[in-house]
């Protein structure tokens, strides 16, 4: 709770600066050194990316928004750290994943890497494959927002909890010739090259290239990570148009590193042999067996263009493509290991999977700004379409035929009769979406009114992977309204209220459940929110109160079946308070963080069995505070504390304990033979705490051990 107190004491202090970047529909301005939208301290930006509405000042937005800058991404996104290590700097986000699974929650609702946007385009990342080093900003809008984000394109989760958008690095006005070496874990070495140039008489063309090479052992025993990647961003800007093309390839291979566990259950409750959550074991040990691995490669293309055609009017187009192949995924059945008693004994069959995904996306829209009397209008009309297909392993051998694992959390895990068969993929599902969005922001004096509506239809087919014949089909459609109101009594204060919604496609149950291939009804998520924002003197504080209602998909056990069922059984309500603070706290002191209080309850469950009980795996308290001391222009120290409260699982039968972790780092800038060099040292999980994170649902995620990271960056 110490982080909660620290963040609350910062509270409503002061704030500064202005903004302008992008998400869906409007392209970024060319980035220059010393961006005006970045708050003092450089850890966050004062801009708010609002989907098809383009770029908005955070004070003009009727939602909670956060933008993490490249400084924050680099500081907390170490080579061996999961993506969530960066994302949790937003107090609405909680980590529920590992390096094997880019899983996280926003306001208690699960998301994965596959629900991320890149330059406003959905479906370009995956649960396993989401490189953060390509991003100059990571932007968040908390809460469901189909009305401004358009169509989803994810085979695992929707963006019901909020929108997370990666903004790719672009060439700056100054040439970039950057080489960076890293060392982390036990023997993990990384090399990163970053080159940027602008060309043309007015520097209208820009090229930015980022490469990655990473290989070696992490801080976890027998946990190897290998990655190679190259990404190129080409942009063009003149008086009447802006264009951006991002393209790239990445290969990622991880040996070992299993951290996801479940508890054996019966009829939705733990079996009699489990009376408590076992204490977290040594996080530095590997809880897999030799041969367990995950390896994938993928390509992405993202194209954005906007063109002025009249005074105050422009049209825009966005398109994206992602191909990703998970070549190997050898792990325990259901992607985790099962704890069967209080002693921490393990029993699991193994499985081997292969997944091939393809995503296509296209959007066309028009935006106009005009007046009707004293009213100022900013109107956007956009239509989009998305296609998605997935192939999965025809036979995953999770019936025990490829072997099993046994052992104990505290004494070691071993394999029994293990062999690794050849895996062939077969068509698993195909999705198509069609959507249209209309929004108008009306401004009058100190007030703004947002009125928007999104209509979309989805067609989902599931297939027998062995025969590739259709086994299920569902068509769905929905209208999602969005409306909000902002009133600014003076230049420092902004009060807002809003309503927003999200509607998913109707999901195909994954192969880890007994009802694999079944299509669940589309789940609708609705949010009402109001809040206040304050900015002054280099500091921004934002407080929001929200109420979210979502159709509740839950895991259910039935007697006579070896695996659980995944069913839509009722409704969940998430009521909470979110506070965020960013900027310069005092001379030489910068701060970023906040807290979230979340009361998540189940409603309308089968036979009322679990009505009023906590949503499984959702912590009531969540807080983060990052504090930086800049002694001078060359030396700084940064620390971060993260607190996650207790979380109920198995319908309040068990409870995952709270935990508090700390990170600490230093940066020193100097010159070697006239070459600017930045030396950095970072320690993640400073106290080497062993703890469980409650996975959304009834799972447990084991922490990563204390990890040191050293780097040297040369600006040639």
PLM region spans:
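Gram-negative outer-membrane beta-barrel transporters
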Residues: 446, 547, 567-651, 687, ...
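Structural signature of Gram-negative outer-membrane beta-barrels, strongest in the C-terminal barrel
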Residues: 357-359, 374-388, 427-550, 574, ...
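Periplasmic plug
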Residues: 67-70, 84-89, 96-148
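A beta-strand signature from Gram-negative outer-membrane beta-barrel systems
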Residues: 134-178, 203
